[in-house]
Structure formats: structure tokens, C-alpha cells
Amino acid sequence: MPKSKINSPEENFDSSAAAGVDRRTPVKLNASGTPRWYIVIMLGLMLLGLAWLVVNYIAGPAIPLMVTLGPWNYLIGFGLFIVGLLMTMGWK
């Protein structure tokens, strides 16, 4: 049977790959990450928003500021929580 002139295994064999030589360029990783203060503020806002809603639900009528704000308490609580959640998109 005649040999194929295209794609013969002898011609495609790379001796450097068989020898274990790595020819890829190393990629430099950004080791900076997210600063600790960012994570603290992010988690703090989420917890503060949750605490605001819980306090409003449990002791809202007994706290004069909560009574004055009325339904705005929900906007404040959910707003703080959502800002914390939006900050998670910047967390690396």
C-alpha cells in the first residue's frame, strides 16, 4: 500500500514536546486581589441593612426615629443591603 504524503506521523512528531520542554509563555497573575477594607465595608453594609430591617420589624413602633421614617425604613434597609450586594461584583 502506498504511503500518504500528507500528515505522515514522522513529520508531525515534535521532539521538544516529547522531551517535556514547555514552550508556553508564563502568565503573570495579578496578586493584589480586593483590599480588606472593601470586603469589610461590603459585608458591613449587607449586615447593617439586614439589622435595620429586623429592628424595624421587631421594635419599630418603640423607636421614635423608626416611627418618624415610617415606610422609608424599608427603602433604607433594602438600599443598604443592595449596595452591599452590588459591591460583590467588584470583589476579586
From Swiss-Prot:
Keywords recorded for this protein, A-Z: Cell cycle, Cell division, Cell membrane, Membrane, Transmembrane, Transmembrane helix
The organism's place on the tree of life at top rank: Bacteria
InterPro entries: CrgA
Cell compartments where the protein resides: Cell membrane
Any one of the GO BP annotations: cell division
Membrane topology, from the record: Multi-pass membrane protein
A GO CC term attached to the entry: plasma membrane
Transmembrane segments annotated in the record for this chain: 39-59, 65-85
Pfam families reported in the protein's UniProt record: CrgA
Predominant cellular place of this UniProt entry's protein: membrane
Similarity section: Belongs to the CrgA family.
Family annotation (NCBIfam families): PRK00159.1
HAMAP family the UniProt entry points to: CrgA
Function text: Involved in cell division.
Full protein name: Cell division protein CrgA
Organism, as annotated: Corynebacterium urealyticum (strain ATCC 43042 / DSM 7109)
